[in-house]
């Protein structure tokens, strides 16, 4: 069964108070959501943290096949290795995502608008 993971992160200013939102669906039905404040972060850090938290939930719940959707083109392209990760703070987060990706039998990271 292939799940869908929708992730979003936002920062009130850049950096500033940040929050993340995650929704996990199976067959079009929402099975889990996460919404929380993450402290002070940039928009890109928040986007990465949403992805990390969503992937962690999937790993912890033995979800092995997933399609991921984010509205951050930067994060999608960096994770898919089409863009270089230049910022040191994002390199750490990108590395965490790469480690988590290894836990899946199938994973696809997509950009949505």
Residue ranges of predicted features:
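RNase H-like nuclease fold core
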Residues: 1-45, 56-60
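RNase H catalytic domain
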Residues: 10-14, 52-113
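Loop-to-helix element that buttresses phosphate recognition and phosphoryl-transfer chemistry
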Residues: 46-50
């Amino acid at each position: 069964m292939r799940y869908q993971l929708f992730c979003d992160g936002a920062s009130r200013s850049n950096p500033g108070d940040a929050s993340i939102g995650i929704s996990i669906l199976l067959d079009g039905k929402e099975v889990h959501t996460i919404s929380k404040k993450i402290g002070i972060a940039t928009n890109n850090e928040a986007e990465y943290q949403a992805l990390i938290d969503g992937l962690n939930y999937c790993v912890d719940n033995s979800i092995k096949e997933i399609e991921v959707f984010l509205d951050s083109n930067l994060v999608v392209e960096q994770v898919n290795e089409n863009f270089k990760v230049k910022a040191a703070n994002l390199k750490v987060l990108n590395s965490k995502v790469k480690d988590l990706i290894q836990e899946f039998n199938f994973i696809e990271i997509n950009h949505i608008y």
